[in-house]
Amino acid sequence: MLFTSISFLYYFLPIVIILYFIVPKKFKNFILFLSSIFFYFCGEPIYTFLMIGEIFIAYVGARYLEKHRKKSILVSLLAIHIGALGLFKYSDFTINNINQIFGSKIPLLKLALPIGISFYTFQIISYVVDVYRGKVKAQKSFLKLATYVSLFPQLIAGPIVRYETIEKELDNRTSNFENFAYGVRRFVIGLGKKVLIANMLGELCDVFSTTNEKSILFYWIFAISYSLQIYFDFSAYSDMAIGLGRMFGFHFLENFNYPYISKSITEFWRRWHMSLSSWFRDYVYIPLGGNRKGTIILVRNIFIVWALTGIWHGANWTFVIWGLMFGIMLIIEKLFLTKHLEKMPSILQRIYVLFTVMISFIIFNANSIGEAWNNIIGLFGANGESLINASTVYYLKSYLVVLVIAIIGSTPLLKNIIEKLKIKTNANKIINLLEPIAMASILIIVTAYLVDNSYNPFLYFRF
């Protein structure tokens, strides 16, 4: 079941909301847990039991860990949860590489990847490690821990919510009109970003992938379009998750903060998928020593973190290269580039970031290293295509409006204009009046689109 499906929008979600608000407070977590299990079961009937099993192991293990505080217990728990992730996500990748290197013929396991396993595994790991560190107390209620891990708003594609972030809200959270209204508004904005912008950009990217009439300009259009698509697709899911969480009284942390206005790669990763980058910082980079043990250890730690970040996204060498590319850029910035960047005009700093990120997403999108390389050199005419052709002009005209909207929407320009207008009393009243009309209009347009286009998964579902 997808957030962008008629069944979710007009059946599942309204029923859950009604049940949640009519039951007594002590049953609210139970309603959310059952709803989340049903939500997951609709997409992954068999793997629902895997998730529940992992939650139970974390529940029992964390309580035992809190009493005995032994590293061996922590290592055992981490081995179980990381092992489950590795089995389903990386077994065939590992076997395939062994076969290629040694010429062996080990059969592939061909295990389907459980949806959301990368996200809920990281949540479980953060919970267990924080219990070991004494940052949080082990949850005594299995229901509350299960609700935290399986909470349907963020179960499938994040953001990665730390247990400490919503620990108190599992016991006591405020459900009021202000929270609910904010949640609805945030959800609808995300819905619009996904269906009306990300999906349209996805259509343009699909055209590029299938057409034989490429040009140098079309390579650039594709690179820009995919960079915008993945931003709007993933940030839309985060908006919807944060909005859904707020409807039920949970305050999830932000996951994106206009990353494409960054002036360095370091800043970019403080603005892009913030829950993932902060997770690797707190649970891998800092435990390895961070930047406290000299340059060689710093470089080693960054390489490890970004190799893991790449492989977390998928079992393909393109993801490893994508991660290591960012690792190398971050090392270069830390060692010497930052001081030179700061002396450059802001526009040049941003061009440097946008070009680097665009190249990285070409690699990220590719199914193979060869495909990635072909699309990168195509930007510079090395594939022999003409600068422009009739097909490129046609598709540019067809998608120009959505490209312009996406470019503007990826910056805080519109947000800043609205905030400045709100300072003026009369303008603020007009905005408050128009806002619900705008939200209703988006919902109507999206619904009309979804009636004819029933399946439109988020890009991050495959991770």
Located regions from the model:
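Membrane-embedded transmembrane alpha-helical bundles that form the catalytic cores
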Residues: M1-R462
